[in-house]
Amino acid sequence: MEQYQAYLELRRSRYQDILYPLFFRESIYGLAYGHESFFTENVDYNNKFSLLIXQRXSTRMYQQTHFSLCANDSNKNTFVGYNYNFDSQIILEGFGVVVEILFSLQLFISSLRGLEIVKSYQNLQSIHSIFPFFEDKLIYLNHKSDIRIPYPIHLEIXXXXXXXXXXXXXFFHLIRLFFYYYYNWNSLFPPKKRISTFFSKRNLRIFLFLYNLYVWEYESIFLFLRNKCSQLQLKHFLVFFERIFFYEKRKHLVEVSTKTCSYTLFFFKDTFIHYVRYKGKSILVLKNTPLLINKWKYYFIYLWQCHFDIWAGPGTIYINQLSQXSFHFLGYFLSXXXXXXXXXXXXXXXXXXXXXXXXXXXXXXXXXXXXXXXXXXXXXXXXXXXXXXXXXANFSDFDILDRFLRICRNFSHYYNGSAKKKSFYQIKYILRFSCIKTLARKHKSTVRTFLKKLSSEKLLEEFFTEEDLFSLIFPRTSFTLRGVYRGRIWYLDIFFRNDFVNHF
């Protein structure tokens, strides 16, 4: 193993040299369309791809080593071929595979060297730890900042970030030339679309890679600011140095006394700061004065403007107090509410009951997200009304019942941790009525006549009872413990969660 690690260490300085030749191999493009991406599912380009087409495109690319980019000779420039859209799509997919190979090699080498990534980030948590964090720590914090990660990022900045990760200069200049020649950055990233939709389907692999690279760069700087902000010293008039201009100011500092330098602003040294991100939104919560969270707001604005050349509008960051405002996150409507709890205190021989106010995180099922998810599954109309699913009318009665039961089960699992389930019960009624309408349409009858004829009302009630849905989560033997443990249970299916989150 040590010899193998030494071999990988030797190859570490050379593996970037293989990126440029890999870009011209047709087998890379076969991998692009034959295997799934690390970032998303496999994307098919209208089923027009074949290895022969990719081989011809790579052959043309390899033969034309000089690129004529003059304006007077624009008609003769055939860097890829006559079908620009299709050939450029093939090249983008190949580029996505090459950079994924690069980052997979980096992860593999890091894992053999003692899992440096895991050791460097001891506080790295999965998405499953978000809900315990909301219930255990969020109630003790008092300020929250809703952050919408801005876009689009300039192409040159994204290319510079990719160059820092890939040390192959030839490969970097080739893909940079290709981007500037064939594409307009504003057309790739429409400025008035949400982050979840501005990645076009035909370029999903490469765009997800570039966006994740941008987020990684942005959060790395944020982590640096978080770790170093409490170590900055002050001048004699107690002005806190901004991290963005810290190195410039340090050059012109006048030497002051040790006593003056020892002062620090205590409210900038905050250990209770938490950052949670999912897709294009993030939440920054902390426990301190409003001045600190306003400082962090301007940190983010200056970071986006100075480092990424992005104008952050006034609606990018919203600052609220947790006790006075609620927020949407991961399909839930969360708020920190104060609940009165009675505690028995024993003093000497007498016992007295004292009422204490305890903060609890109250989560409610969002009706808009639940209705939109049900409409996306063709189980309800867009106006949150029951509708007959025409696509399921050709199935058997059992398959139709099983389909609606599965949707209702997912809703029940996902919102089981919510305190108020009024919206969920409304969606449950819509699903039940849509199931009846679908069965009635299949048998060419009205809903009332169908229920009377087949006596299915009892069957549907059995399928959609709360007891039956709860038994799918816990075994029957655990029902006796329900009176002892009354804690809420969060459903942590990360794949099904996307159906709810995408509607925000």
Swiss-Prot record:
Origin species: Lablab purpureus (Hyacinth bean)
Gene label: matK
Cellular compartment(s): Plastid, Chloroplast
Family named by the database record: Belongs to the intron maturase 2 family. MatK subfamily.
Gene Ontology terms: biological process: mRNA processing; RNA splicing; tRNA processing
Name of this protein: Maturase K
Role, per record: Usually encoded in the trnK tRNA gene intron. Probably assists in splicing its own and other chloroplast group II introns.
One GO location term (cellular component): chloroplast
Main location: plastid
Molecular function terms, GO-annotated: RNA binding
Database matches in PANTHER family: MATURASE K
